[in-house]
């Protein structure tokens, strides 16, 4: 058993990096092959050539007949079978150990980088904890990537070796050993009868070893099926990812989104009507349309640079609006509607209204219907028209023109306060009448 200790120590590493079925296969290999082959097979086939007897005295005939009956010893054949079947497992163990060590180095390197980034220096206690956790973590692994492919390949090679040795055993010996073997090879003079020792015991042992080989073969096939179903299940759980070039072309409709949502109990105004914005959906991988060309800078207006505040009139030319007296009929809407195309007439009316207001302010002391010369008359000395005619020209009736108090029309040198009192007395007298 000391000769098998080295192989046993190496195969123990396989047990740490295998599935459940792989561990069962290793158990069958250790107990039912190596152990039985080392303890019982040597005693059964110990006297194999010495007990092979032939009924001839011809020198060399017995050795030639034994070589024809047993080209290779059963024990040596089974040893070769164990070595060949274990070789893929040894190769897988070497790759698994290398993979685990590389993972440990990568994790330790990442931990050091994180420690340097965080600015924390790990002491000896932390390093020992990392080493202990790394040694424990070697037994925990996941069959994925290259490690999974290597594991599947080593199972396939084990299966092929098992099938090859079973077929070779059948062609060499068959599945049983007969007690009588007839030999006619040279230098035997004729057909020679040879006898095999313990044929029944050897047949039972051969059948047992073939059954163990069949169990190992079944475990290999079962493990391949288990890994295949596991891969199919994980592939079905993943979302299907299609490359960009294989996306089918579909006509996508636009999505209409209302810019203003109607509130409950309110009615939208004319300018707040719902406008639908269309956002066309584009396919992945389609060429985007080129953006609109930028407008040249010469289309923009130059801003007028203003200096101090006194120069604001140059940048902003604004005029205050002027107001004219309007009759009651026009205020109430009784006047004739203005035509749409009468824009120049409106400007002339505004100028005349301004001129009338200035004249009325100057003629406060003049009685109604009296003609007074104004500074704005022509050089030829034309007389000013009465106020009633001017008002009629502006579209106002003469009856509705405001009349002034007679006391205020006469020239009076009294101050304004006395004049206002006199006008109020006159108005009260008019009311009493």
UniProtKB/Swiss-Prot annotation:
Changing residue 45 to S: In CTRCT1; uncertain significance. SMART domains: CNX, Connexin_CCC. One of its GO terms (biological process) is cell-cell signaling. GO terms for cellular component: connexin complex; plasma membrane. Changing residue 198 to Q: In CTRCT1; cataract with microcornea. Eye lens. Changing residue 88 to Q: In CTRCT1; severely decreased gap junction channel activity; does not localize to the cell membrane. Changing residue 46 to R: In CTRCT1; uncertain significance. Belongs to the connexin family. Alpha-type (group II) subfamily. This is Gap junction alpha-8 protein. It comes from Homo sapiens (Human).
